[in-house]
Amino acid sequence: MVINDIESLTAQALAEVAAAQNLDHLEFLRVALLGKNGSITLQLKQLGKLPVEQRKAIGEKLNRVRDLISDALMDRKAALESAALSKRLIDERVDVTLPGRRGERAGLHPVTRTLERITEIFARLGYELVEGPEIEDDWHNFEALNFPLHHPARAMHDTFYFGDGRLLRTHTSGVQVRYMSDHRPPLRMIAAGKVYRSDSDQTHSPMFHQIEGLLLDKHATFVDLKGTLSEFLRAFFERDFEVRFRPSYFPFVEPGAEVDIAWQQSDSSVRWLEVLGCGMVHPNVLKNVGIDSECYTGFAFGLGVERFAMLRYGVDDLRAFFENDVRFLRQFS
């Protein structure tokens, strides 16, 4: 081996390093020159075969060459990485003058909106919002509410029963029973939540939301009931219309009534729409919860939240509320 060979090898190596166009090629050169079997490494391994008088000089020369090539590799790597970063910054450049992307605006479900609207109106009238269990026993769901044993609501085809006799509540009236058992009159409360019945069509769902209200006091009358519900309907729909109380039967009230409103349709015609049920609390219900019906009277009412949502938002099919179609729900955001 002669010095000229080393100088020639060095010049070629530095030229190849300087000409490398990407990091992969540069790594290939590093292995070819300085790797375990690289050309410079092999030269260093051959030093032992040289005469003693040449070994030191050539060894020093090879070490300088190795350091020189190593520095050149690092410099070229830094240059390639810098160039790659600059290109990426140019390619990924953001035009700050472009309009920003608006985030998706979320909104409450129309049933939730309606539920909150109803409870807020009754809160202004002094009613306390109370919750209760969705799995009930026969006593709280039927017996305490004066349902006779033969009443069709107790039938398997109308109610979802568990094997132990418990059931999914068919109304929120059971919450009223629990509340009256723990509180003494005078009292005002509403019970809101999910209820379950074996029914499904365009205007009925196996699960829906119901709000029931109760007032107990001395000398409460049907006139008070009519005034309360008429005020609620005006506040909810934000308009005045004729309200009709039509006699009807419910086991837990006497007398009972259905409430109809004179609803103006899209073609400007008017028809009566049933919107809720109500009545004076039956003396047997008060007796079952230990309240003296000779001293206290009261009224109760119940309404379907989805029914009111359909009327407020002009929805024809109740099932649309539960299909989670974003195109439908986005209208109410």
UniProtKB/Swiss-Prot annotation:
Q: Which InterPro entries match?
A: aa-tRNA-synth_II, aa-tRNA-synth_II/BPL/LPL, Phe-tRNA-synth_IIc_asu, Phe-tRNA_ligase_II_N, Phe_tRNA_ligase_alpha1_bac, Phenylalanyl-tRNA_Synthase, tRNA-bd_arm
- Signal peptide start and end residues: none
Q: What is the protein's name according to its record?
A: Phenylalanine--tRNA ligase alpha subunit
Q: What are its GO cellular component terms?
A: cytoplasm
Provide the residue positions that the database annotates as binding Mg(2+): 254
Q: What organism is this sequence from?
A: Xylella fastidiosa (strain Temecula1 / ATCC 700964)
**Does the record's keyword annotation contain ATP-binding?**
yes
Cross-referenced PANTHER family: PHENYLALANINE--TRNA LIGASE, MITOCHONDRIAL, PHENYLALANYL-TRNA SYNTHETASE
Query: Which reactions fall under this protein's catalytic activity?
Result: tRNA(Phe) + L-phenylalanine + ATP = L-phenylalanyl-tRNA(Phe) + AMP + diphosphate + H(+)
Pfam families xrefs: Phe_tRNA-synt_N, tRNA-synt_2d
Which GO MF terms are attached to this record? ATP binding; magnesium ion binding; phenylalanine-tRNA ligase activity; tRNA binding
